Amino acid sequence: MEKLIILLLVASLLVTTDSVVKGKKAARGWLFNEVETCELGGLGDPCSGSGDCCCDQCLCSGSYEHCTQNPDRWFCCRTYGN
């Protein structure tokens, strides 16, 4: 019985942690229009093949976003338009 309770506690903790991580990712994505974090890349490099590029942040302007370069952290920024 004790093992079952411990197992349930561990399972609920894993689910909670997963939800929190997904929630933070979703919030960050909404804030910076981030699709995913890129391991490597540069200004204008393709990220997902749908007009995205690797960059450190997205600067929204009109119908598309400009990407700026930062070697420490890469985001995948979605462009809209040209």
Swiss-Prot record:
May contain 5 disulfide bonds. Its main location: secreted. It comes from the Eukaryota. Residues 1-19 form the signal peptide. GO terms for cellular component: extracellular region. Keywords: Disulfide bond, Neurotoxin, Secreted, Signal, Toxin. It is found in: Secreted. One of its GO terms (molecular function) is toxin activity. Expressed by the venom duct. The cysteine framework is XXX (C-C-CCC-C-C-C-CC). Probable neurotoxin. This is Conotoxin Cal30. It comes from Californiconus californicus.
